């Protein structure tokens, strides 16, 4: 979302330092998940670049799946949110790399919470995700990287393009897997039986 990148202050920290911080955050996320008992890779014994079957035990176990689009959308939203909150602070304006680190912290924290026993059981009880037992570490880290991709894309794309892509993702996911970021949040916070029944149907497209 190119809200006004020309007004952003230039990062005083070298690019290598930002990359190092980002890698450390990913390593920390992976370490915490490992300490929580999450499996490094799919228990099937291999890693796929893409797994497109949502209602299966391998969903959220490989590098990318249909929910990766939702994590790209996280990046869109985090770019806009951090721009509004931090880009023009009078005392401490944050450069875009610093705001990306903030976004990675938020995404990483959510990945850890999402893989807690409480949230896993919440998904299984309140949604159609009966085969969901949490993410593999490689999938969780990949989700954070998908968010980074969305953040970087939002930085260079016009706002209207970012919004249109986000809407296209939501519509595509709703029609193909009967789920998306909006429905995911709704069913996690306040499950609705009618929505759950609708989600159990076959792909619309």
From Swiss-Prot:
What membrane topology does this protein have? Multi-pass membrane protein
Key word Membrane present in the record? Answer: yes
Kindly list the GO CC terms recorded for this protein: plasma membrane
Q: Which InterPro entries match?
A: DUF2585
Pfam families, alphabetized = DUF2585
- Give the family this protein belongs to, as stated in its UniProt record: Belongs to the UPF0314 family.
Mind telling me what this protein is named?
A: UPF0314 protein bll0647
């Amino acid at each position: 979302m190119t809200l006004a990148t020309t007004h952003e202050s230039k990062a005083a920290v070298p690019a290598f330092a930002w990359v190092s911080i980002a890698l450390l955050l990913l390593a920390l996320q992976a370490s915490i998940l490992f300490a929580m008992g999450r499996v490094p890779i799919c228990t099937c014994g291999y890693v796929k670049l893409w797994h497109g079957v949502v209602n299966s035990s391998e969903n959220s176990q490989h590098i990318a799946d249909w929910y990766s689009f939702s994590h790209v959308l996280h990046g869109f939203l985090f770019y806009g949110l951090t721009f509004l909150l931090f880009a023009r602070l009078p005392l401490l304006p944050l450069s875009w790399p610093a705001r990306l680190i903030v976004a990675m912290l938020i995404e990483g924290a959510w990945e850890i919470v999402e893989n807690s026993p409480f949230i896993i059981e919440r998904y299984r009880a309140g949604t159609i995700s009966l085969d969901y037992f949490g993410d593999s570490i490689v999938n969780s880290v990949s989700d954070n990287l998908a968010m980074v991709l969305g953040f970087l894309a939002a930085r260079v794309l016009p706002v209207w393009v970012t919004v249109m892509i986000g809407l296209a993702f939501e519509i595509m996911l709703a029609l193909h897997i009967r789920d998306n970021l909006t429905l995911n949040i709704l069913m996690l916070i306040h499950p609705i039986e009618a929505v759950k029944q609708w989600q159990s149907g076959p792909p619309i497209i």
